[in-house]
């Protein structure tokens, strides 16, 4: 790609700036391009780690002038290095972020929540380095990689053995080749790689659910070993497509980017419970439920419960003959029992009907008085031996008003072949209890 304008170059170790009017990047020697890449990577590392920037923008092929950078110069290595592979930039960026996470332990740790999206060392007031294409590319890659980040916590233990699986193709592959800053040589990757033997912080160790401190350190070392193997494969396949799986785009620190193992303590409580509670103890627990019942059968209430139903049953037995009241009648100095009075209602209003013909029966007498609403019963008295009528009967009413109307309207009316004669029934006066009561009252009054 030949530049139309002057293409500046970054100075090497004490070398002057090479202005080239009309000269493009292909005209530069290998050492100059190497110096430019090393300077850019050093500047990018400084921005990522949050170190103060000297205000020198990164060299871009279309910028007319670039000030000299003395503090960021790195001595050129005379050794000829292999061509940078397509995945080298992403690999170096991953290692830089791992180092930034290790250095960020001094800063107040970030409370657990959504994954970190912005650059590591950017502050709210420092926005001067956001204009560089490297910073914008890193921010874009982090935002693109932040979407499927929660899914990285679900894979099982297999992810602890090898390097992380490659994610979806990121946007850097769609950018023009020169838009991305060329990565440093492979020799500088070893210098920029953070020490993998450092113990993880307590906050990172606490992310494991069922692992202890030693198990967490072993998992971090295993993941780091897998990362070194992946970088070695990338170095062997330089000049072509990446020979091994590699992560495209930035990732979280090793302890955070590692997929957490499955929580092992979850099935343990069930096994422990099953082991501690043998099948012989389960019915014992079930038998504890009816224990509150013993307070009920206390000695005094129990005796009362046994004694109470007996008198109740005796009362019922005694009450049955009491219900069958004996209706003892008395008249003319003699007494007899009349069970027929039990067929009548004790609270009714009864009328005596006399001078009935032989043809009058209960139905005829009831038909004659049934026009009154509160009519209850009508009966003709007959001889028990012959069955002939004795010439009289009784009619009862529930309402006293109907009783009075029947006395007025039905007295002297024909029922059958004869007119009947009505008067008030005196059946209560012939009751033995009533007779004795009246006799006592007469004695008190001195009548007898």
From Swiss-Prot:
Keywords: Acetylation, Cytoplasm, Methylation, Nucleus, Phosphoprotein, RNA-binding. Residues 204-448 are annotated as: Necessary for interaction with HNRNPK. Residues 349-427 form the RRM domain. Residues 11-27 have a biased composition (Gly residues). The keyword RNA-binding applies. One of its GO terms (molecular function) is mRNA binding. The modification Asymmetric dimethylarginine is found at residue 149. Its main location: nucleus. The modification Phosphoserine is found at residue 132. Residues 313-324 have a biased composition (Basic and acidic residues). The modification N-acetylalanine is found at residue 2. Interacts with HNRNPK. Belongs to the RRM RBM42 family. This is RNA-binding protein 42. It comes from Bos taurus (Bovine).
């Amino acid at each position: 790609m030949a530049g139309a304008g002057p293409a500046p170059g970054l100075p090497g170790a004490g070398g002057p700036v090479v202005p080239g009017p009309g000269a493009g990047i292909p005209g530069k020697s290998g050492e100059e391009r190497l110096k430019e890449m090393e300077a850019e990577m050093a500047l990018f590392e400084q921005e990522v780690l949050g170190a103060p920037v000297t205000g020198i923008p990164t060299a871009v092929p279309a910028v007319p002038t670039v000030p000299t950078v003395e503090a960021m110069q790195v001595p050129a290595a005379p050794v000829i290095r292999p061509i940078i592979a397509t995945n080298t930039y992403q690999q170096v960026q991953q290692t830089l972020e791992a180092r930034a996470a290790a250095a960020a332990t001094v800063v107040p740790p970030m409370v657990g929540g959504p994954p970190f999206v912005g650059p590591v060392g950017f502050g709210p007031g420092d926005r001067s380095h956001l204009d560089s294409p490297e910073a914008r590319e890193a921010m874009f890659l982090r935002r693109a990689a932040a979407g499927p980040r929660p899914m990285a916590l679900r894979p099982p233990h297999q992810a602890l053995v090898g390097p992380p699986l490659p994610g979806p193709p990121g946007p850097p592959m769609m950018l023009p080749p020169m838009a991305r800053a060329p990565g440093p040589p492979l020799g500088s990757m070893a210098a920029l790689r953070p020490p993998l033997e450092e113990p993880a912080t307590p906050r990172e160790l606490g992310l494991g659910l069922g692992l202890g401190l030693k198990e967490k350190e072993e998992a971090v070392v295993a993941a780091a070993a897998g990362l070194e193997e992946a970088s070695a494969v990338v170095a062997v396949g330089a000049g072509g497509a990446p020979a091994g799986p590699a992560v495209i785009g930035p990732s979280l620190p090793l302890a955070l980017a590692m997929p957490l193992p499955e929580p092992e303590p979850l099935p343990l409580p069930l096994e422990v419970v099953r082991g501690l509670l043998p099948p012989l103890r389960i019915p014992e627990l079930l038998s504890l439920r009816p224990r509150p019942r013993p307070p009920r059968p206390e000695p005094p209430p129990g005796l009362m419960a046994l004694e109470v139903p007996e008198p109740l049953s005796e009362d019922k037995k005694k009450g049955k003959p009491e219900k069958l009241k004996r209706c003892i009648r008395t008249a003319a100095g003699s007494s007899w029992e009349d069970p027929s009075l039990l067929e009548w209602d004790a609270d009714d209003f009864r009328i005596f009907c006399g001078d009935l013909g032989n043809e009058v029966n209960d139905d005829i007498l009831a038909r004659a008085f049934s026009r009154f609403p509160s009519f209850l019963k009508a009966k003709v008295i007959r001889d028990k031996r012959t069955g002939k009528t004795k010439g009289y009967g009784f009619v009862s009413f529930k309402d006293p008003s109907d009783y009075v109307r029947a006395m007025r309207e039905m007295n002297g009316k024909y029922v059958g072949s004869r007119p009947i004669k009505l008067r008030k029934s005196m059946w209560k006066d012939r009751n033995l209890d009533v007779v004795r009561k009246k006799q006592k009252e007469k004695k008190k009054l001195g009548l007898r």
